[in-house]
Amino acid sequence: MSEFNFDPYRRYGGGMAPMAPQSRYVLPSYIERTAYGVKEMNPYNKLFEERIIFVGVQIDDTSANDIIAQMMTLEHIDSDRDITLYINSPGGSFTSLMAIYDTMQFVRPDIQTVCVGQAASAAAVLLAGGTKGKRTALPNSRILIHQPATEGTHGQASDVEIMANEIMRIRHQLETILAKHTGRSVEEISRDIERDKILTAEEAKEYGIVDDVLPYRKASLK
């Protein structure tokens, strides 16, 4: 069986360095008293209660399924209230990205997107894919867009041709989505993603990926 080092479905990873294995900070739990008694909580549970989904990992099938399940649940609870995605992600799988993106467009609630830290590669598409007028970034956020990455291929000539055609199809799909949400032409997007295009929060606003840069809430820092 032919083997490919490069998989366009899983190599849409962002950043200027390879993505390292993920490690998890141990989340604290706490007891919250309510009118119905006491319950054990953690920060993610509390965010979910406030209709906030935190995308703080690489985008793969597992994280995509979790994010989609949360969006569908929140739509079921209340289809008229916004859902907010906080994004701090280096990117990841293209098919996983598309699963989340399609769900964002499918559910009835508006989707607010907020970049904290970075939205690179696939994560930048999620950031741009939020509801127009409700896409934001914190002041020191880093946003990166680029073409789907390759690491070289080998195998039969017909297999290489199939994979080359597929990566071009994926690239065109990416360009079309970014053009739709930024208001720029497909041709301009195509030129810009030839190499890594790194944007500050203000540059991302000018480019059309976000609509506003959030000010700090501390009065002393305004």
Swiss-Prot record:
Q: Which UniProt keywords apply?
A: Cytoplasm, Hydrolase, Protease, Serine protease
* MF term (GO), any: serine-type endopeptidase activity
Q: Report the InterPro entries cross-referenced here.
A: ClpP (IPR001907), ClpP/crotonase-like_dom_sf (IPR029045), ClpP/TepA (IPR023562), ClpP_His_AS (IPR033135), ClpP_Ser_AS (IPR018215)
- CDD domains noted in UniProt: S14_ClpP_2
Q: Name one GO biological process term.
A: protein quality control for misfolded or incompletely synthesized proteins
**Reactions that this protein is recorded to catalyse:** Hydrolysis of proteins to small peptides in the presence of ATP and magnesium. alpha-casein is the usual test substrate. In the absence of ATP, only oligopeptides shorter than five residues are hydrolyzed (such as succinyl-Leu-Tyr-|-NHMec, and Leu-Tyr-Leu-|-Tyr-Trp, in which cleavage of the -Tyr-|-Leu- and -Tyr-|-Trp bonds also occurs)
Q: What does this protein do?
A: Cleaves peptides in various proteins in a process that requires ATP hydrolysis. Has a chymotrypsin-like activity. Plays a major role in the degradation of misfolded proteins.
Q: What is this protein called?
A: ATP-dependent Clp protease proteolytic subunit 1
Organism whose genome encodes this protein: Thermobifida fusca (strain YX)
Gene name of the record: clpP1
